[in-house]
Swiss-Prot record:
SUPFAM superfamilies associated with the record: RING/U-box
The name this protein goes by in its record: E3 ubiquitin-protein ligase RNF185
Transmembrane residue ranges: 131-151, 172-192
Gene3D superfamilies: Zinc/RING finger domain, C3HC4 (zinc finger)
Gene: Rnf185
Domain notes: The RING-type zinc finger domain is responsible for E3 ubiquitin ligase activity.
Organism whose genome encodes this protein: Mus musculus (Mouse)
Annotated spans, Disordered: 1-30, 90-123
CDD domains noted in UniProt: RING-HC_RNF185
Residues in the Mitochondrial intermembrane compartment per record: 152-171
InterPro entries for this protein: RNF5/RNF185-like (IPR045103), Znf_C3HC4_RING-type (IPR018957), Znf_RING (IPR001841), Znf_RING/FYVE/PHD (IPR013083), Znf_RING_CS (IPR017907)
Composition-biased stretches (Polar residues): 1-13
Amino acid sequence: MASKGPSASASTENSNAGGPSGSSNGTGESGGQDSTFECNICLDTAKDAVISLCGHLFCWPCLHQWLETRPNRQVCPVCKAGISRDKVIPLYGRGSTGQQDPREKTPPRPQGQRPEPENRGGFQGFGFGDGGFQMSFGIGAFPFGIFATAFNINDGRPPPAVPGTPQYVDEQFLSRLFLFVALVIMFWLLIA
């Protein structure tokens, strides 16, 4: 019993050596002014700290951005429990400048801007979706395009080009080129 006395007094002296916060490095659990909380998203000191119902601490700007980027599936970034704006609790402590709810001052969302696509005339090559190029596949005696009807892409044909335009000239060139290739293949099959 007597041997426990000196060690107990030594530990009391060590805990009081850090000053009024109760810790020598300022990060103790005693709740000193130097103690900080870390956000579980940015891993920095939590600014406008909020705590989820599952017990995880976040900066409100970080959590707000997390929730805005996943509007259909709002889960806790740590444990994947359900989370929303209403399921977080603002955390106030010593040294906080204002007692305003951090959920009320959400960062402003930037306005979406959609520039109009530039209209490029003429044949754009074989880039799918770029120049209106479309392929239709058929099997044997069914050239109407089984794949096109199965995937519901058969109605996306652009109107025919107006004669005299560069697009019309390109289409005629490709038509003649494919006809020539088909004739060469048929001739090769006949002589083989």
